[in-house]
């Protein structure tokens, strides 16, 4: 979530163990920056990072001036973040996307890679696995893939039914 990203501090990122601790959320109200609790209780979580992202974050933190471990790593507003993404998409000649679209794409990718809805819900901070199930429509071939895997399993065990 945008607010979770924009609330991150150096203290929240452990590049050695490749984790991010999500414990707060950023918002702006009446021109003032506010750091509060994440959207739901399940939003508070520790997310495992792939190596490439841990390395990118490490390089970013080293590039920045010596950040106070309590200062936001990305000290800009949601508007600025979305506007930057919009501009980048335009320059790249691709369809405009929102930050939330990246979250949606991440869930879709994890579903396609075969991760369980429960594991994805934990990673995304979904309050309920039912929220994760909203993405199921994105993969209409999953039913066919399941049937093919079951066929392969039965054939490998020599238990296929022949006529």
Predicted regions and their residues:
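Active-site/catalytic core of tyrosine-dependent DNA strand-transfer enzymes
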Residues: 17, 25-28, 50-95
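Mobile genetic element proteins and their domesticated derivatives, centered on retroelements
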Residues: 5, 22, 49, 85, ...
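C-terminal secondary-structure termini that scaffold catalytic or DNA-interacting sites
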Residues: 17, 30-32, 36-44, 51-53, ...
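Short, charged phosphate-coordinating catalytic segments
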Residues: 1-26, 118
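Short basic/aromatic active-site micro-motif
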Residues: 76-79, 95-114
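Basic, Lys/Arg- and aromatic-enriched nucleic-acid-binding interface segment
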Residues: 1-2, 6-8, 16, 52-55, ...
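Catalytic-site neighborhood detector that most strongly recognizes the C-terminal catalytic loop/helix
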Residues: 26, 54, 117, 124-149
């Amino acid at each position: 979530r945008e607010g979770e990203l924009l609330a991150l501090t150096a203290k929240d990122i452990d590049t050695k163990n490749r984790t991010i601790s999500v414990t707060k959320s950023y918002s702006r109200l009446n021109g003032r920056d506010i750091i509060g609790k994440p959207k739901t209780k399940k939003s508070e979580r520790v997310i495992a990072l792939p190596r490439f992202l841990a390395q990118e974050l490490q390089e970013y933190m080293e590039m920045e001036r010596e950040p106070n471990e309590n200062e936001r790593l990305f000290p800009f507003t949601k508007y600025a973040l979305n506007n930057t993404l919009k501009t980048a998409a335009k320059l790249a000649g691709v369809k405009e996307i929102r930050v939330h679209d990246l979250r949606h794409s991440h869930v879709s990718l994890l579903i396609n890679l075969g991760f369980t809805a429960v594991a994805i819900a934990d990673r995304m901070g979904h309050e309920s696995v039912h929220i994760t199930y909203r993405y199921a429509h994105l993969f209409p071939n999953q039913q066919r893939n399941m049937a093919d895997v079951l066929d392969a399993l039965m054939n490998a065990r020599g238990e296929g039914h022949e006529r």
